[in-house]
């Protein structure tokens, strides 16, 4: 059985999706004869048309995709499956997803509340049953087990919350407030290796995607998962965050896989006191749990179990294969 994978490979971006797509090609080769087509011929083209067997709406046989998508096509029937790490479903992914030939779409940024509006905008509510939550990945792969072992050998950890990244003076101003109040380790830029060392030496993490003013409609900054969330989870580092609305197929659950701040509390605090109010919610939750070793150990145990079952040991490939229902293609 022959299949073809279509994508624009963006090596320059250096994020997790391209390595995953290539790994998944290899996984698929256990079941099919796989031809992989990279449409980025000059090294600088990161979106554009691909060539399929069947028509996709007004685009005919050449619908556009971006570098965060991969289309898997059955070379005999023209049936397609779509994998997408996009935050903006209505930019490219929607065209493939709503086509008659596409029987399954997996979204890394999936929100049950938003997906209806995404499909409605494209007049494709009937295709909702084909859209499913998927997985999310760390920024890049690393030796998770070795860092887990190192963390287990550390006698004294930094009690302050840890968060490393950018945007704290623009679209993540709340984090700067927490830092200025002394509850967050100094925010710096590190190499990836130094970053991981910083994480495992920390007792508790902070997770935060964007200031709450950004979430105005289902189409504004809809993706709230961050690489840090998965890196914390892989390493078993409890982290505090506002309750997720986005979900993976096997969801990260509040007060099971992370330390939750109720979403409604965050919006009330923001409405009354702005970023300062949200920062105080984080600080108060931190004070509540920092010395509760039983609760933190419970979170860690559940995080590691989730990571092992959904990400590590080829399980991200196995789960993807199952969710795409590719077993039906095996003859």
Predicted regions and their residues:
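Nucleotide-sugar donor-binding catalytic core of glycosyltransferases
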Residues: 2-49, 53-257
């Amino acid at each position: 059985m022959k299949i073809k994978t279509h994508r624009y490979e963006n090596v320059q971006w250096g994020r997790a999706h391209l390595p995953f797509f290539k790994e998944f090609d290899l996984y698929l080769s256990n079941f099919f004869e796989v031809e992989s087509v990279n449409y980025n011929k000059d090294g600088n083209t990161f979106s554009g048309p691909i060539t399929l067997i069947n028509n996709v709406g007004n685009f005919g046989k050449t619908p556009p995709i971006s570098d965060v998508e991969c289309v898997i096509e059955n070379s005999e029937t023209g049936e397609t499956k779509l994998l997408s790490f996009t935050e903006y479903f209505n930019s490219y992914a929607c065209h493939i997803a709503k086509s008659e030939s596409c029987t399954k779409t997996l979204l890394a940024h999936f929100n049950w509340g938003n997906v209806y509006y995404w499909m409605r905008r494209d007049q494709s509510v009937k295709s909702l049953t084909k859209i499913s939550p998927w997985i999310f990945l760390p920024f890049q792969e690393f030796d998770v087990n070795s860092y887990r072992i190192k963390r287990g050998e550390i006698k004294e950890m930094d009690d302050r919350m840890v968060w490393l990244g950018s945007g704290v003076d623009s679209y993540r101003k709340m984090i700067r407030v927490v830092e200025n109040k002394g509850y967050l380790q100094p925010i710096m830029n590190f190499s990836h290796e130094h970053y991981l060392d910083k994480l495992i030496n920390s007792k508790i993490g902070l997770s935060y995607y964007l200031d709450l003013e950004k979430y105005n409609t289902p189409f504004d900054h809809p993706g709230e998962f961050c690489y840090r969330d998965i890196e914390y989870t892989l390493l078993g580092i409890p982290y505090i965050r506002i309750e997720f609305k986005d979900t993976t197929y096997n969801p990260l659950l509040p007060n099971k896989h992370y330390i939750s701040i109720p979403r409604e509390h965050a919006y009330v605090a923001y409405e009354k006191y702005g970023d300062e109010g949200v920062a105080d919610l984080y600080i108060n939750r931190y004070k509540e749990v920092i010395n509760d070793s039983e609760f933190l150990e419970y979170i860690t145990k559940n995080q590691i179990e989730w990571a092992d079952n959904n990400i590590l040991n080829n399980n991200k490939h196995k789960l993807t294969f199952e969710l795409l229902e590719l077993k039906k293609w095996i003859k």
